[in-house]
């Protein structure tokens, strides 16, 4: 397994629309395993392949406290089951150290394929509903900051760029 570099906002590659997975291969399974390792190390609860510069429709998530309930969604489709929305404070591994409220449908149906290539369908609410919609946005080239006002988005961009520069300086200092 390997840790994968996570793209940071405003990297334009985050705007790439992901292509469907044509076949679940060993390469796809390995990418999912690497994505789990990367997500757990970050740490995070969800990661879309687009965030690690692989522009295919693949999402990994684990919402459990003990990090022992991994979920994989290949070629996911999400359908709102209600018009009712709920605000939820979101963060993102591609937008480090930034959190803000986003309104999303409170209940959704998820249709996807698992790592064995089998189709499945679940209904979700709460954190799972929020997380799958957040990760689906990544596959469509969208970030949670796109839901914010232009002024807030510009401030987020400046903060993230500063954080990324600081991380780069720390990497250089460690290499010396």
From Swiss-Prot:
SUPFAM superfamilies in the record: Peptide deformylase
Molecular function via GO: metal ion binding; peptide deformylase activity
UniProt-listed Enzyme Commission number(s): 3.5.1.88
Entry cofactors: Fe(2+)
The reaction(s) this protein catalyses: N-terminal N-formyl-L-methionyl-[peptide] + H2O = N-terminal L-methionyl-[peptide] + formate
Active site positions: 135
Record has Amino-acid biosynthesis as a keyword: no
Binding annotation for Fe cation: 92, 134, 138
Metal-binding found in the keyword field: yes
Domain of life: Bacteria
An individual GO BP term: translation
Xref: Gene3D superfamilies: Peptide deformylase (3.90.45.10)
Keywords: Hydrolase, Iron, Metal-binding, Protein biosynthesis
Cofactor, free-text remark: Binds 1 Fe(2+) ion.
Record family assignment: Belongs to the polypeptide deformylase family.
Main function: Removes the formyl group from the N-terminal Met of newly synthesized proteins. Requires at least a dipeptide for an efficient rate of reaction. N-terminal L-methionine is a prerequisite for activity but the enzyme has broad specificity at other positions.
The protein's name in its UniProt record: Peptide deformylase
Organism annotation: Acinetobacter baumannii (strain SDF)
Organism ancestry: Bacteria, Pseudomonadati, Pseudomonadota, Gammaproteobacteria, Moraxellales
Gene: def
């Amino acid at each position: 397994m390997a840790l994968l570099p996570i793209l940071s906002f405003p990297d334009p590659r985050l705007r790439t629309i992901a292509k469907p997975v044509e076949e679940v291969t060993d390469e796809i399974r390995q990418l999912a395993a690497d994505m789990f390792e990367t997500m757990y190390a970050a740490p995070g609860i969800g990661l879309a392949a687009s965030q690690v510069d692989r522009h295919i429709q693949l999402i990994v998530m684990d919402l459990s406290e003990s990090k022992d309930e991994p979920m994989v969604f290949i070629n996911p489709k999400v359908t709102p089951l209600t018009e009712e929305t709920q605000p939820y404070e979101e963060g993102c591994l591609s937008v480090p150290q930034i959190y803000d409220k986003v309104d999303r449908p409170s209940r959704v149906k998820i249709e996807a394929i698992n790592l064995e290539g089998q189709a499945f369908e679940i209904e979700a609410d709460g954190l799972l509903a929020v997380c799958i919609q957040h990760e689906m946005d990544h596959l469509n080239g969208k970030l949670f900051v796109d839901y914010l006002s232009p002024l807030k988005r510009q401030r987020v961009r400046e903060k993230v760029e500063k954080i990324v520069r600081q991380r780069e300086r720390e990497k250089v200092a460690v290499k010396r």
